[in-house]
Amino acid sequence: MKYVGLAYFTPEKFAAMAQSDVKALVSQCPALDEKMRATGKLVVSASLGDLEGWKTLRPRGGKTQVIDGPYTEAKEVVGGLFIIDADSPDEALRLAGMHPAATLGEEGGWAVELIPLDFYLAP
């Protein structure tokens, strides 16, 4: 079964970190990403762009309305995502636990939300 992992961060907490701490934190991510990739269960992993570039599209009166920024104002924001293909819920938790946002970044408000996918359309 496939699962999507949403990697969250708290912009205010992340912005309050010293640049040297941010660099030290981010420098640890590639090794954890590679550990996850080495399982052969990672379908895709992505880091999302800056919030200033986000757009929300909504149907309104038969037309599509485009709004700048994230859909909701929230304390935590999705900063990345991944999709894994796990044989069981326990394996999904183990795999998601390898993601940097699940193991590092407490000071930046990092967290992972793991969600089973009901539908997945591959290209």
What is each PLM-predicted segment?
Residues 1-123:
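Conserved, structured core segments of small domains
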